[in-house]
C-alpha cells in the first residue's frame, strides 16, 4: 500500500437498509470514482440512526477494508453523512438593539448568527444554520452589512438533530480507526448534487424516499427554507406485502418486479404475468400487489 490516502476522497453513508462507502479522486476538475462498497444494515441502523454500535462498526470496518483493497492504501479519514429521523429544521429570530444609529458590520451579523447556533434544544444540537432574511428598522434587507440602523433582526433556519446521532457515529468510526473529516447533512448534500441553481432560485422541493425515512427539503431564492424527516419509507411497502402469503425475504423482490404507483396499470387478462409465483410454489394474484 504505497499510495497516500490524501490523494483520495472517501465518503460513507449510513442508511437504514445499507451502509455504503465510495472513494474517488479529483482529476481535471471532476471527480473520478475509483471504488464502491456496501453492506446490508441488518439490526444496526434504524430510521437512519445507529442503535447497535458494535454491528455498525463491523459493517463500516468491512467497507473500509474493501475500499482499501481497491485503492491499495490505508484509509485514515472519511466524510460521513448525517441523516435520520431526528434531522429537521427550526426557525429562530435573533434581535439586537444597537442603541445608536450606526453602520451594521460583518462582526455584528456574525455575532447574531452565532447566537442562533447557541439556542438550547433539549437533547438536540444545531448541525447547520441558514440565514433567511434580516430586518433593519422595519425594512427587510437581504444583506444588511453597511446599512445604517438602530435595530436589527435576523431570521435563521437551524438544522437540528438529536445529539446521539453524531456521538454514535463518532464512536463507530473511532472504533474503526477512521477520523471523520466532516459530518455532512445527507439531505442537503443530495440536493446540492441533483438540483440546479435555477431550480433552487425559482423554488422547488426535493423528496428522497429511503428505506425507513423520507426527507423533504424546500428551496427558494437559493436558500434552504424547510427540512423535515418523516418516519415513513419503502420498508413500509414491504410490511404491507408481508400481510400476503409471501415470505418476508421475498417482499423486496415482489415490490421491485410488480409494484406500480400508477392506477392505470394494465390488469387485463392479456397482461403477463397475472400471478407471482413464490419460491415454494404459491401463486399471488398480481392485483393484490399493484
Enumerate the predicted regions with their spans.
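Glycine-rich phosphate-binding loop of actin/hexokinase-like ATP-binding domains
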Residues: 202-243
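Nucleotide/phosphate-binding catalytic cleft detector across ATP-hydrolyzing
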Residues: 1-18, 22-205, 223-225, 234, ...
Amino acid at each position: 500500500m504505497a499510495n497516500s490516502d490524501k490523494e483520495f476522497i472517501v465518503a460513507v453513508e449510513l442508511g437504514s437498509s445499507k451502509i455504503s462507502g465510495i472513494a474517488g479522486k479529483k482529476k481535471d476538475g471532476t471527480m473520478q470514482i475509483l471504488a464502491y462498497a456496501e453492506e446490508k444494515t441488518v439490526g444496526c441502523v434504524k430510521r437512519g440512526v445507529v442503535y447497535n454500535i458494535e454491528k455498525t462498526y463491523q459493517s463500516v470496518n468491512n467497507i473500509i477494508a474493501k475500499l482499501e483493497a481497491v485503492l491499495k492504501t490505508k484509509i485514515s479519514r472519511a466524510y460521513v453523512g448525517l441523516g435520520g429521523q431526528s434531522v429537521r429544521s427550526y426557525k429562530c429570530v435573533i434581535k439586537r438593539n444597537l442603541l445608536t444609529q450606526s453602520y451594521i458590520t460583518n462582526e455584528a451579523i456574525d455575532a447574531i448568527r452565532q447566537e442562533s447556533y447557541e439556542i438550547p434544544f433539549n437533547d438536540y444540537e444545531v448541525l447547520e444554520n441558514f440565514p433567511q432574511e434580516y430586518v433593519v428598522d422595519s425594512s427587510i434587507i437581504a444583506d444588511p452589512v453597511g446599512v445604517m440602523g438602530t435595530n436589527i433582526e435576523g431570521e435563521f433556519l437551524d438544522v437540528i438533530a438529536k445529539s446521539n446521532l453524531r456521538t454514535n457515529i463518532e464512536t463507530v468510526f473511532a472504533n474503526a480507526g477512521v477520523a471523520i473529516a466532516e459530518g455532512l447533512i445527507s439531505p442537503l448534500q443530495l440536493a446540492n448534487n441533483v438540483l440546479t441553481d435555477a431550480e433552487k432560485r425559482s423554488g422547488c422541493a426535493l423528496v428522497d424516499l429511503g428505506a425507513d425515512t423520507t426527507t423533504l427539503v424546500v428551496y427558494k431564492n437559493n436558500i434552504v427554507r424547510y427540512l423535515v424527516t418523516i418516519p415513513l419509507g419503502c420498508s413500509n411497502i414491504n410490511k404491507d406485502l408481508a400481510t400476503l402469503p409471501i415470505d418476508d425475504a421475498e417482499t423486496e423482490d415482489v415490490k421491485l418486479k410488480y409494484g406500480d404507483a400508477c392506477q392505470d396499470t394494465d390488469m387485463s387478462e392479456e397482461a403477463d404475468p397475472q400471478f407471482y409465483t413464490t419460491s415454494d410454489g404459491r401463486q399471488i394474484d398480481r392485483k393484490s400487489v399493484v
